[in-house]
Every structure is written in C-alpha cells, then in structure tokens.
C-alpha cells in the first residue's frame, strides 16, 4: 500500500519530459520507471546525494549530472522529439534543449536496461540517512 501511495504522489508532479522519460524507459528497458526507479538508491527519484549504491543507482547519478549540464533548460518540463529507427531511439527536433534532455533520458534508459541483472531490491525505498557520504563529482 505504501508503494502505491508513493507512486500516486510522484505522479502528481509529473509533466513534460518526465512523462517522456517514463515512456523511453518502458521502450528500452521494458520496465516502468515509476515502479522500478522512482525511489531506488541515493539518486533514483527526487534529489540525490551521497554516493551511488550500485550500477543502477549510478545510472540515476549520471542522469542527474547530464540534466545538470543542460544549461538554460528545465529538464523536468521541456518536451522533446524522438523517433525509433531499427529499434534504436533517435533524438531530434529543432529545440536544442529538447534534444539535450532526450539524449540524457535515452542514455539513462539504456543504462537501466544494461544493468537489470544487478538491480537489488534492498535499494528500493533506500533510507536517505544511508546516503550521507561525500558525493563524487559529475
């Protein structure tokens, strides 16, 4: 029941590219980003601090860094354009911000897919108090 409540709360704030990010994760990793990655480790979900706990958490850390490098963009609300060509996601469109955010989301979705074998349920709903180590630079 607690998980359903968390998902409902997270959906309240979802807009723009966050919906598209969920779609990319579903297409590439064949999993729901909300159900698998919205509250995982120290970096998957809102905020992020400490050190990534495993390869999956590192996907979120790198994604946060990628968003941080998207200068003059609001990554959580910018919509973007992409297509599928030969089973691959291709980011495009005329908006440089949108393309940059799409590339961040695409890389994270691929990272999630590639690290499914190392996903560890012990990091789901991981307590923030366990994420107090000095963060590494992006």
UniProtKB/Swiss-Prot annotation:
GO biological process, one term: phospholipid metabolic process
Pfam families per UniProt: Phospholip_A2_1
Enzyme class per UniProt: hydrolase
Cofactor dependency: Ca(2+)
Active site: 63, 105
A single cellular component GO annotation: extracellular region
Tagged with keyword Acetylation: no
Location relative to the cell: Secreted
Main localization of the protein described in the UniProt heading: secreted
EC number: 3.1.1.4
SUPFAM superfamilies per record: Phospholipase A2, PLA2
Signal peptide bounds: 1-16
Similarity comment: Belongs to the phospholipase A2 family. Group II subfamily. D49 sub-subfamily.
Official protein name in the record: Acidic phospholipase A2 beta
UniProt source species: Crotalus adamanteus (Eastern diamondback rattlesnake)
């Amino acid at each position: 029941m607690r998980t359903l409540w968390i998902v409902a709360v997270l959906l309240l704030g979802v807009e723009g590219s966050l919906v598209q990010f969920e779609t990319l994760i579903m297409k590439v990793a064949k999993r729901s980003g909300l159900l698998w990655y919205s509250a995982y480790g120290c970096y998957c979900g809102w905020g992020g601090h400490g050190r990534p706990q495993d390869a999956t958490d590192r996907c979120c850390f790198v994604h946060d860094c990628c968003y941080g490098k998207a200068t003059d963009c609001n990554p959580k609300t910018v919509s973007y354009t992409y297509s599928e060509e030969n089973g691959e996601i291709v980011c495009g469109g005329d908006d440089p911000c949108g393309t940059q955010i799409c590339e961040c989301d695409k890389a994270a979705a691929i990272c999630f897919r590639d690290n499914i074998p190392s996903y560890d349920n012990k990091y789901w709903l991981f307590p923030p108090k366990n994420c107090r180590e000095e963060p590494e630079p992006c």
